[in-house]
């Protein structure tokens, strides 16, 4: 067919007959996929937590170019199981205890399927009213559960790193409104604790504050920020002609899950007119429990707070929420509307594109809406209480075992501990445990020492899994010593 003929052909490549075949193919494949997903969620423990692959194995196994002709769903599903699955680290595995769990619960998975089918893009209200308004409703529900003030406006981003970057950019906007046009001043200073997440420094790099202008506030023996030293550092920087503009307090640090004294940090922030951002990406969910709500004491005085439902609210990645009591400043920092996106203003229409860098927006709120409704507050509270109780029990086992020592408080369900030996011996122990495929742990460094981490929070984890994890660790300790890789008792 000539180009002219092709250009004049108004028949869709998917005519009605082909569309019917396409729909039937999809129906069969989707049913197979749902059956596979249900079986996987029920039997994830059949797989090794970590895949037994080497870097480059999957690249070498797959074709070097895409096919010229299309392939049937059956071939795609077959290759998924035979080639992709063996290279997967199973975050849904009950014994995935390396990082804060990102468990894909059934209601959220169903919601993700529906969101993908709708394929809506929530650029502004008109492009998808449901995206804009369900986000407001769902984040309002969660705000109530967390005990945050009603004036806190919520918006969804993908990860806490991005949420915090937007908060810090808003902080810069409050301190230096000219930065949007002229760029950052060189004397802006940001404060955060020695235990804060690396994304805070990355945010300073990304928005032009500079890594050298990030002050790491020392922590106490429980790895919590010291507000007295924060006050001293801010005073010194002001005296030196610098402009402190933001402080980040953490509720549930990544290494130890320590909780900074937010109320005391807020006092310093108010004294020096700093934007207070609270990183509650992990532990914020615990505030749903009445007995844990104190961890957010002082957060009502913050300018912004981030929490991640994809960490401990059984919502698959990615979904991070930024709450702020100054949405006007956040909007001022980012709103930039080209003519083709201008729509009629309405007081109840929220255009989410005005509150961040991304223009395109997935329907992320749908999966959180499904999760909150499916489990309910009481169901989520039961799960959180179980995880925290198991974490406390694991900590007690460590305390009772002479060969091990706990090196940090365990306020939630993450325990930091180490074998009473060298860093090399602890590293060897971790390598053996993870290579077994029975359990996946991670490590950190505290006070210059190599430390093991157990993070309990997976939806499928049982008390028996936690017990098994401890026995696996103890067993490999004995075995590693027997192989001569642990040298000291």
Locate the predicted segments by residue.
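PLP-dependent enzyme catalytic core of the Aspartate aminotransferase-like
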Residues: 446-489
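A short linear hydrophobic-aromatic micro-motif
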Residues: 152, 402-405, 438-443
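Conserved PLP-binding catalytic core of the aspartate aminotransferase-like
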Residues: 405-433
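Active-site C-terminal subdomain of aminotransferase-like
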Residues: 253, 272, 297-399
